[in-house]
From Swiss-Prot:
It comes from Shigella dysenteriae serotype 1 (strain Sd197). This is GTP 3',8-cyclase. Coiled coil: none annotated. One of its GO terms (molecular function) is GTP binding. One of its GO terms (biological process) is Mo-molybdopterin cofactor biosynthetic process.
Length: 329
Protein backbone atom coordinates (compact mmCIF):
# COMPACT_ATOMS: atom_id res chain seq x y z
CA UNK A 1 0.00 0.00 0.00
CA UNK A 2 1.18 3.53 -0.74
CA UNK A 3 1.49 5.96 2.14
CA UNK A 4 -1.66 7.11 3.95
CA UNK A 5 -3.25 10.21 2.42
CA UNK A 6 -2.28 13.14 4.65
CA UNK A 7 -2.52 16.87 3.99
CA UNK A 8 -0.34 19.82 5.02
CA UNK A 9 -2.30 20.13 8.28
CA UNK A 10 -1.65 16.50 9.34
CA UNK A 11 -5.24 15.44 8.62
CA UNK A 12 -5.53 11.83 7.44
CA UNK A 13 -8.16 10.80 4.90
CA UNK A 14 -9.90 7.46 5.36
CA UNK A 15 -13.23 8.31 3.74
CA UNK A 16 -14.20 8.82 0.07
CA UNK A 17 -17.54 10.29 -0.96
CA UNK A 18 -18.06 9.16 -4.54
CA UNK A 19 -20.87 10.71 -6.57
CA UNK A 20 -22.10 8.40 -9.32
CA UNK A 21 -24.77 10.68 -10.83
CA UNK A 22 -26.07 14.21 -10.38
CA UNK A 23 -29.56 13.18 -11.53
CA UNK A 24 -32.30 13.24 -8.88
CA UNK A 25 -36.04 12.59 -9.09
CA UNK A 26 -36.85 14.70 -6.01
CA UNK A 27 -37.10 18.50 -5.95
CA UNK A 28 -36.01 19.34 -2.42
CA UNK A 29 -36.34 23.03 -1.58
CA UNK A 30 -32.75 23.31 -0.31
CA UNK A 31 -31.10 21.44 -3.19
CA UNK A 32 -33.02 21.25 -6.49
CA UNK A 33 -36.22 23.29 -5.99
CA UNK A 34 -36.79 23.53 -9.74
CA UNK A 35 -35.95 19.88 -10.35
CA UNK A 36 -32.92 18.34 -12.04
CA UNK A 37 -31.61 20.16 -15.10
CA UNK A 38 -28.91 18.38 -17.12
CA UNK A 39 -25.60 20.20 -17.27
CA UNK A 40 -23.55 20.33 -20.44
CA UNK A 41 -20.56 19.11 -18.46
CA UNK A 42 -22.15 15.67 -18.05
CA UNK A 43 -22.62 15.00 -21.76
CA UNK A 44 -19.75 12.52 -21.84
CA UNK A 45 -21.53 10.47 -19.22
CA UNK A 46 -21.06 9.50 -15.63
CA UNK A 47 -18.29 7.25 -14.36
CA UNK A 48 -18.61 3.67 -15.58
CA UNK A 49 -18.44 0.62 -13.34
CA UNK A 50 -14.85 -0.02 -14.46
CA UNK A 51 -13.85 3.59 -13.78
CA UNK A 52 -15.45 3.36 -10.33
CA UNK A 53 -13.56 0.13 -9.67
CA UNK A 54 -10.28 1.82 -10.60
CA UNK A 55 -10.76 5.03 -8.64
CA UNK A 56 -11.84 3.21 -5.47
CA UNK A 57 -8.93 0.78 -5.83
CA UNK A 58 -6.51 3.73 -5.96
CA UNK A 59 -8.05 5.37 -2.91
CA UNK A 60 -7.98 2.05 -1.03
CA UNK A 61 -4.27 1.74 -1.81
CA UNK A 62 -3.86 5.21 -0.29
CA UNK A 63 -5.56 4.20 2.96
CA UNK A 64 -9.26 4.75 2.30
CA UNK A 65 -11.40 2.44 4.45
CA UNK A 66 -14.88 3.78 3.71
CA UNK A 67 -16.67 4.68 0.48
CA UNK A 68 -20.01 6.44 0.40
CA UNK A 69 -21.93 6.38 -2.88
CA UNK A 70 -23.82 9.62 -3.40
CA UNK A 71 -25.56 11.65 -6.07
CA UNK A 72 -27.97 13.05 -7.09
CA UNK A 73 -29.90 9.90 -6.35
CA UNK A 74 -27.51 6.93 -6.74
CA UNK A 75 -30.26 4.31 -7.06
CA UNK A 76 -31.45 5.89 -10.33
CA UNK A 77 -28.48 4.23 -12.00
CA UNK A 78 -29.56 0.90 -13.46
CA UNK A 79 -26.14 -0.57 -12.67
CA UNK A 80 -26.18 0.57 -9.03
CA UNK A 81 -26.01 -2.98 -7.64
CA UNK A 82 -23.05 -3.70 -9.95
CA UNK A 83 -21.33 -0.56 -8.66
CA UNK A 84 -21.67 -1.74 -5.06
CA UNK A 85 -20.24 -5.13 -6.03
CA UNK A 86 -17.32 -3.49 -7.86
CA UNK A 87 -16.35 -1.46 -4.78
CA UNK A 88 -16.84 -4.53 -2.57
CA UNK A 89 -14.16 -6.42 -4.54
CA UNK A 90 -11.50 -4.52 -2.59
CA UNK A 91 -11.00 -6.01 0.87
CA UNK A 92 -9.28 -2.83 2.13
CA UNK A 93 -12.60 -0.99 1.90
CA UNK A 94 -14.37 -2.04 5.09
CA UNK A 95 -17.50 0.08 4.74
CA UNK A 96 -19.64 0.80 1.66
CA UNK A 97 -22.55 3.13 2.30
CA UNK A 98 -25.13 4.98 0.25
CA UNK A 99 -26.99 8.24 0.76
CA UNK A 100 -30.42 7.92 -0.85
CA UNK A 101 -33.82 9.58 -0.92
CA UNK A 102 -35.28 6.13 -0.22
CA UNK A 103 -37.31 6.02 -3.41
CA UNK A 104 -36.15 2.49 -4.33
CA UNK A 105 -35.22 1.16 -0.90
CA UNK A 106 -38.23 -1.07 -0.40
CA UNK A 107 -37.76 -2.75 -3.78
CA UNK A 108 -33.98 -3.08 -3.91
CA UNK A 109 -32.36 -2.85 -0.47
CA UNK A 110 -32.01 -6.62 -0.01
CA UNK A 111 -30.14 -6.86 -3.32
CA UNK A 112 -27.88 -3.98 -2.34
CA UNK A 113 -26.99 -5.73 0.91
CA UNK A 114 -26.25 -8.97 -0.92
CA UNK A 115 -23.94 -7.03 -3.25
CA UNK A 116 -21.92 -5.75 -0.28
CA UNK A 117 -23.57 -2.57 0.99
CA UNK A 118 -22.88 -2.07 4.71
CA UNK A 119 -24.55 1.26 5.50
CA UNK A 120 -27.56 3.35 4.50
CA UNK A 121 -28.39 7.03 4.97
CA UNK A 122 -31.92 8.06 4.02
CA UNK A 123 -32.99 11.68 3.62
CA UNK A 124 -36.16 12.43 5.62
CA UNK A 125 -36.75 16.10 6.43
CA UNK A 126 -40.18 15.71 8.03
CA UNK A 127 -42.27 12.97 9.64
CA UNK A 128 -45.44 14.68 8.44
CA UNK A 129 -46.45 13.29 5.04
CA UNK A 130 -47.83 16.60 3.78
CA UNK A 131 -44.77 18.56 4.84
CA UNK A 132 -42.51 15.85 3.37
CA UNK A 133 -44.34 16.33 0.06
CA UNK A 134 -43.94 20.11 0.28
CA UNK A 135 -40.18 19.86 0.94
CA UNK A 136 -39.33 17.14 -1.60
CA UNK A 137 -41.88 17.76 -4.34
CA UNK A 138 -42.77 14.06 -4.15
CA UNK A 139 -45.68 12.37 -2.38
CA UNK A 140 -43.46 9.45 -1.35
CA UNK A 141 -43.41 9.62 2.46
CA UNK A 142 -45.06 6.24 3.04
CA UNK A 143 -42.87 4.64 0.38
CA UNK A 144 -39.71 5.95 2.05
CA UNK A 145 -40.87 4.80 5.50
CA UNK A 146 -41.56 1.33 4.07
CA UNK A 147 -38.06 1.40 2.61
CA UNK A 148 -36.51 2.06 6.01
CA UNK A 149 -38.47 -0.88 7.44
CA UNK A 150 -37.26 -3.01 4.53
CA UNK A 151 -33.65 -2.09 5.33
CA UNK A 152 -34.02 -3.48 8.84
CA UNK A 153 -35.73 -6.59 7.46
CA UNK A 154 -32.82 -7.06 5.04
CA UNK A 155 -30.43 -7.25 7.99
CA UNK A 156 -29.11 -3.73 8.52
CA UNK A 157 -28.71 -3.25 12.27
CA UNK A 158 -28.79 0.54 12.06
CA UNK A 159 -30.12 3.05 9.54
CA UNK A 160 -28.97 6.66 9.45
CA UNK A 161 -31.54 9.31 8.59
CA UNK A 162 -30.46 12.74 7.36
CA UNK A 163 -32.67 15.71 8.24
CA UNK A 164 -31.78 19.20 7.05
CA UNK A 165 -32.49 21.52 9.96
CA UNK A 166 -34.61 24.48 8.87
CA UNK A 167 -36.01 27.32 10.94
CA UNK A 168 -39.82 27.46 10.92
CA UNK A 169 -39.96 24.19 8.95
CA UNK A 170 -38.79 21.38 11.24
CA UNK A 171 -36.58 22.87 13.97
CA UNK A 172 -39.48 22.80 16.45
CA UNK A 173 -40.27 19.09 15.83
CA UNK A 174 -37.55 17.58 18.04
CA UNK A 175 -40.02 15.69 20.24
CA UNK A 176 -41.68 14.10 17.20
CA UNK A 177 -38.33 12.90 15.91
CA UNK A 178 -37.24 11.65 19.33
CA UNK A 179 -40.44 9.63 19.73
CA UNK A 180 -39.77 8.07 16.33
CA UNK A 181 -36.28 6.82 17.28
CA UNK A 182 -37.00 5.82 20.87
CA UNK A 183 -37.52 2.15 19.97
CA UNK A 184 -35.76 2.08 16.59
CA UNK A 185 -31.98 1.81 16.02
CA UNK A 186 -31.94 4.90 13.82
CA UNK A 187 -29.20 7.50 13.97
CA UNK A 188 -31.09 10.70 13.20
CA UNK A 189 -28.66 13.31 11.89
CA UNK A 190 -29.69 16.94 11.89
CA UNK A 191 -27.66 18.81 9.28
CA UNK A 192 -27.40 22.57 9.41
CA UNK A 193 -28.71 24.23 6.27
CA UNK A 194 -25.69 25.24 4.19
CA UNK A 195 -25.50 28.15 1.81
CA UNK A 196 -24.98 27.24 -1.86
CA UNK A 197 -24.64 29.41 -4.93
CA UNK A 198 -28.30 28.94 -5.81
CA UNK A 199 -29.67 28.89 -2.26
CA UNK A 200 -28.67 32.18 -0.62
CA UNK A 201 -32.22 33.44 -0.09
CA UNK A 202 -33.38 30.13 1.39
CA UNK A 203 -30.34 30.13 3.67
CA UNK A 204 -31.07 33.61 5.02
CA UNK A 205 -34.66 32.65 5.71
CA UNK A 206 -34.28 29.18 7.23
CA UNK A 207 -30.76 28.72 8.65
CA UNK A 208 -30.59 27.93 12.35
CA UNK A 209 -27.55 26.77 14.31
CA UNK A 210 -27.44 23.16 15.42
CA UNK A 211 -26.17 24.45 18.75
CA UNK A 212 -29.80 25.12 19.69
CA UNK A 213 -30.52 21.38 19.44
CA UNK A 214 -27.25 20.40 21.09
CA UNK A 215 -28.01 22.53 24.13
CA UNK A 216 -31.47 20.99 24.37
CA UNK A 217 -30.15 17.42 24.03
CA UNK A 218 -27.55 17.97 26.75
CA UNK A 219 -30.23 19.48 28.98
CA UNK A 220 -32.27 16.28 28.53
CA UNK A 221 -29.38 14.00 29.46
CA UNK A 222 -28.05 12.96 26.04
CA UNK A 223 -24.36 11.96 26.07
CA UNK A 224 -21.75 12.96 23.47
CA UNK A 225 -20.01 9.96 21.84
CA UNK A 226 -16.42 9.69 20.60
CA UNK A 227 -15.80 9.61 16.83
CA UNK A 228 -14.04 6.78 14.99
CA UNK A 229 -11.41 7.66 12.40
CA UNK A 230 -13.57 6.86 9.35
CA UNK A 231 -16.76 8.41 10.73
CA UNK A 232 -18.37 11.38 9.07
CA UNK A 233 -18.51 14.85 10.63
CA UNK A 234 -21.50 14.29 12.91
CA UNK A 235 -21.34 14.87 16.65
CA UNK A 236 -23.26 11.83 17.90
CA UNK A 237 -25.33 11.69 21.09
CA UNK A 238 -26.92 8.72 22.84
CA UNK A 239 -29.38 8.30 25.71
CA UNK A 240 -30.01 5.22 27.89
CA UNK A 241 -33.76 5.42 27.25
CA UNK A 242 -33.44 5.45 23.45
CA UNK A 243 -32.56 2.75 20.93
CA UNK A 244 -31.72 5.48 18.43
CA UNK A 245 -29.04 8.16 18.39
CA UNK A 246 -28.89 11.81 17.40
CA UNK A 247 -26.18 13.25 15.18
CA UNK A 248 -25.51 16.94 14.63
CA UNK A 249 -23.60 18.21 11.59
CA UNK A 250 -22.69 21.86 12.10
CA UNK A 251 -20.37 23.14 9.36
CA UNK A 252 -20.48 26.71 10.68
CA UNK A 253 -19.09 25.72 14.07
CA UNK A 254 -15.54 26.73 14.94
CA UNK A 255 -13.00 23.98 14.16
CA UNK A 256 -15.49 21.96 12.06
CA UNK A 257 -12.79 21.43 9.43
CA UNK A 258 -10.08 20.43 11.93
CA UNK A 259 -11.22 16.80 11.90
CA UNK A 260 -11.89 16.55 8.15
CA UNK A 261 -11.17 12.99 7.02
CA UNK A 262 -12.96 12.82 3.66
CA UNK A 263 -12.41 13.60 0.02
CA UNK A 264 -14.90 13.74 -2.82
CA UNK A 265 -14.92 12.53 -6.41
CA UNK A 266 -17.69 13.80 -8.67
CA UNK A 267 -19.79 11.73 -11.05
CA UNK A 268 -17.60 12.87 -13.96
CA UNK A 269 -14.33 11.96 -12.27
CA UNK A 270 -13.13 15.18 -10.66
CA UNK A 271 -11.43 15.11 -7.26
CA UNK A 272 -12.84 17.79 -4.95
CA UNK A 273 -10.84 18.53 -1.82
CA UNK A 274 -13.79 20.29 -0.15
CA UNK A 275 -17.55 20.40 -0.70
CA UNK A 276 -17.22 24.18 -0.90
CA UNK A 277 -13.88 24.39 -2.68
CA UNK A 278 -13.07 25.80 -6.09
CA UNK A 279 -12.55 23.84 -9.28
CA UNK A 280 -11.47 20.24 -8.97
CA UNK A 281 -8.71 17.93 -10.21
CA UNK A 282 -9.53 15.80 -13.22
CA UNK A 283 -8.84 12.09 -12.66
CA UNK A 284 -10.77 10.64 -15.56
CA UNK A 285 -7.90 10.45 -18.03
CA UNK A 286 -6.20 8.10 -15.55
CA UNK A 287 -9.23 5.80 -15.19
CA UNK A 288 -9.02 4.25 -18.65
CA UNK A 289 -6.73 1.32 -17.85
CA UNK A 290 -5.60 -0.67 -14.81
CA UNK A 291 -1.98 0.08 -15.74
CA UNK A 292 -2.54 3.75 -14.84
CA UNK A 293 -3.08 3.12 -11.12
CA UNK A 294 0.34 4.32 -9.99
CA UNK A 295 -0.06 7.59 -11.90
CA UNK A 296 -3.59 7.97 -10.53
CA UNK A 297 -2.39 7.54 -6.95
CA UNK A 298 0.38 10.08 -7.55
CA UNK A 299 -2.08 12.66 -8.88
CA UNK A 300 -4.42 12.19 -5.92
CA UNK A 301 -1.56 12.53 -3.43
CA UNK A 302 -0.18 15.62 -5.17
CA UNK A 303 -3.59 17.29 -5.24
CA UNK A 304 -3.95 16.89 -1.49
CA UNK A 305 -1.12 19.38 -0.96
CA UNK A 306 -3.54 22.08 -2.14
CA UNK A 307 -6.28 21.31 0.39
CA UNK A 308 -7.12 24.38 2.44
CA UNK A 309 -7.26 24.36 6.23
CA UNK A 310 -10.94 25.35 6.27
CA UNK A 311 -13.92 26.21 4.10
CA UNK A 312 -14.95 29.86 3.75
CA UNK A 313 -18.68 29.59 4.39
CA UNK A 314 -18.46 32.22 7.13
CA UNK A 315 -17.41 34.67 4.41
CA UNK A 316 -20.38 33.63 2.23
CA UNK A 317 -17.97 31.91 -0.14
CA UNK A 318 -19.68 28.71 -1.33
CA UNK A 319 -17.04 27.89 -3.92
CA UNK A 320 -18.10 25.91 -6.96
CA UNK A 321 -21.13 24.34 -5.26
CA UNK A 322 -24.24 25.71 -6.95
CA UNK A 323 -26.42 22.98 -5.42
CA UNK A 324 -25.76 19.91 -3.32
CA UNK A 325 -26.47 17.41 -6.11
CA UNK A 326 -23.41 18.64 -7.99
CA UNK A 327 -20.69 16.77 -6.10
CA UNK A 328 -22.74 14.74 -3.70
CA UNK A 329 -23.42 16.94 -0.68
Amino acid sequence: MASQLTDAFARKFYYLRLSITDVCNFRCTYCLPDGYKPSGVTNKGFLTVDEIRRVTRAFASLGTEKVRLTGGEPSLRRDFTDIIAAVRENDAIRQIAVTTNGYRLERDVANWRDAGLTGINVSVDSLDARQFHAITGQDKFNQVMAGIDAAFEAGFEKVKVNTVLMRDVNHHQLDTFLNWIQHRPIQLRFIELMETGEGSELFRKHHISGQVLRDELLRRGWIHQLRQRSDGPAQVFCHPDYAGEIGLIMPYEKDFCATCNRLRVSSIGKLHLCLFGEGGVNLRDLLEDDAQQQALEARISAALREKKQTHFLHQNNTGITQNLSYIGG
